[in-house]
Structures are given as C-alpha cells and as structure tokens.
Design a protein with these regions (language model features):
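Low-complexity, glycine- and small/polar-enriched segments
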Residues: 1-219
C-alpha cells in the first residue's frame, strides 16, 4: 500500500537501523507534508520614501504536533508506529523596487519551526515472537531567504540590515517495548534539516548606509 511504502522509506531514511531495515506492518501511522509560501515583496517600479525606519519582514511560524501509536499482542505479533513530517515551504523577502529611509532599513525572512510533541509509540507482546518498530522522522527542506533584485535600490540614513533566519526547535521521540520469548524492537528518531538559508543581492542592485553600517546575516 502507499502507506506501507512511505513507512519503509522512512525507516530507511531514519539512518538509525544500519543496513538491515525490517518491513513494518503499519498499525499506527501519521504523515504530513507542507509546502506553504510566505512572501514580503516590494515590486519593480515601487518607490518607498520614509522619514523614519523601514521594516520589511516575511515571517512564518509552524507548530508541529504528531502522535502515532500501536499495540499488538498474540502468538506472533507485529506492530509498527510511524510519524513522518515533511516541510518544504518558502519564506522570502523580495525587494525589486526602491526603499529610502532617513533612519534604519531592516529586511528579514524568518522561518520558525516548533515541534515539542512528535511521537511514535509502539508496544508488542507475544509468546513466540514479537516485532515492534517506532519511527519519528522530521525533514525540513525548502528555502528561507532574502532576494534583492537587479533593479533594487536600498538606502538608509543610518544602518541597513538584511537577515535570513531558520530556527528549528523540534524533538522527534520514539518509544517501544516488546515482551516475549523472542522479541525484537526498533526505535529510530531523526531530525533532518537540509533546507537553504540565503541572502542574494543580484548584480545591479544597490545597498547604501549613509551614516552607519550594512549587515548581511544568514543563519
């Protein structure tokens, strides 16, 4: 089944089971994929002139909750519990026009991911043998960035700050217990962050701080 295929793929990608990865019959399963886009954009031909500060911010906050559980009992039991979350969205601040502020110019793209309750639980019991597996897997891909286009002009009277920031606070947790004459349990949890955090100032763009500093930070 499609669910079974995804479960087995998650087991392999978890990286915790070595080269020997058992196939798990799905008893409890949770899967979610998100590809949201959050953008703050100053378009080409737009001119903004301010006597104070200029703040342009794209901000995305995602709170994750996933709980999957299974219990199996009998002469020969098999129970598997998998929680899989994949985030591949985009958070971007894009400047294509002109911004001029007498004070500070601040441009930021912020992506915050919170996941304090991501759990895969499994319990099995059998007289002859039992196989229990629990996998909690969170994969953060996607892009967090600031793009300053070729025709963009940014001028501040003081400081100009540009920041792209990806913050991940997620703790996938697995728990498993098996009891029997012969029992095997697999528990694997993994947080994989492979996304891109970047600031791109295209050739032809202009950043100026008349009486201060220019700061570019990608975290």
């Amino acid at each position: 089944s499609p669910a079974q295929t995804q479960v087995n793929a998650a087991l392999k990608r978890s990286g915790e089971a070595g080269n020997s990865v058992p196939s798990v019959d799905v008893k409890g399963y949770f899967a979610s994929a998100a590809a949201d886009t959050t953008t703050a954009r100053i378009g080409s031909g737009t001119t903004i002139i301010l006597t104070g500060n200029a703040f342009i911010r794209a901000k995305e906050t995602t709170d994750l909750t996933a709980v999957s559980g299974a219990v199996a009992a009998g002469g020969v039991g098999a129970g598997g519990s998998v929680a899989v979350i994949i985030l591949n969205g985009t958070t971007q601040a894009e400047i294509q026009g002109t911004i001029r502020a007498a004070d500070t110019v601040s441009i930021s793209a912020e992506n915050t991911i919170n996941g304090s309750s991501i759990q895969a639980k499994v319990g099995t019991a059998g007289l002859i043998g039992a196989l229990g597996a629990s996998v909690a897997y969170v994969d953060v891909t996607g892009t967090t960035g600031v793009l300053i286009g070729s025709g963009a002009s940014i001028t501040s009277g003081r400081n100009t700050t540009v920041r792209a920031d990806l913050t991940v606070k997620a703790s996938p947790v697995t728990s498993g217990a098996s009891v029997g004459w012969a029992a095997v349990g697999l528990a694997a949890s993994r947080l994989c962050v492979s996304g891109t955090t970047s600031i791109l100032s295209v050739q032809g763009s202009s950043l100026t701080a008349e009486n201060g500093n220019i700061s570019l930070t990608a975290l």
